[in-house]
Amino acid sequence: IYWFDGEDELHLLNALSSSAAELTAAVDGITADISSDPSTDLYGAVIKSTKIAEDLLKSNTNVIGAASVVLFTDGTDQASRYRESDALNAVKDANRNISFFTIGLGAEIDTEVLEGIGKTASVFAANKEELENTFNQISQRVAEQANSFYLFEYCSPKRDGSGENNLVIRLTNGSLQGAVQTKFNAKGFTGGCE
């Protein structure tokens, strides 16, 4: 968990952890005097958090990896350290296994900008009373994204590269249906064959 103000840096609140209790304690420990800078470096926070997520994925190449950037703000970019276009390009050009979510609070937000940054999902709360529901909505979407990665292993008889394989995956969930199809050469594949 990182927090940001108008300074040209993200401040670490708590390192990456799977402990809900540890993360909750870190958030509960936030006080009103956490920052003395009243400005908002929103675009810088987007650029820097995207880089952190990219680096995390690059450091774990031996596993199926995904990351989520969840940005919570009650304002627009006031620091003018970075351009809006640079922040939106960071999101657009990011690794496709990074999901972007935004949560906006209050009347001083720019919903259009936040929807551009939160390309996976964006939610807005008019006041602090609506925040819990808003956070729960994003939490559910983050969990859905995290649970959408699968490892598929198949021992192809064409491991010598002598032909092309055609893979079709279909999914039906109630009335929802989806499919993806791809062709690949299995030269050197060993998954599922051992």
Residue ranges and their predicted role:
Residues I1-S18, A45-V46, S68-T73:
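Von Willebrand factor
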Residues I1-W3, A26, S68-F72, F101-T102, ...:
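Soluble periplasmic/extracytoplasmic beta-strand elements of cell-envelope proteins
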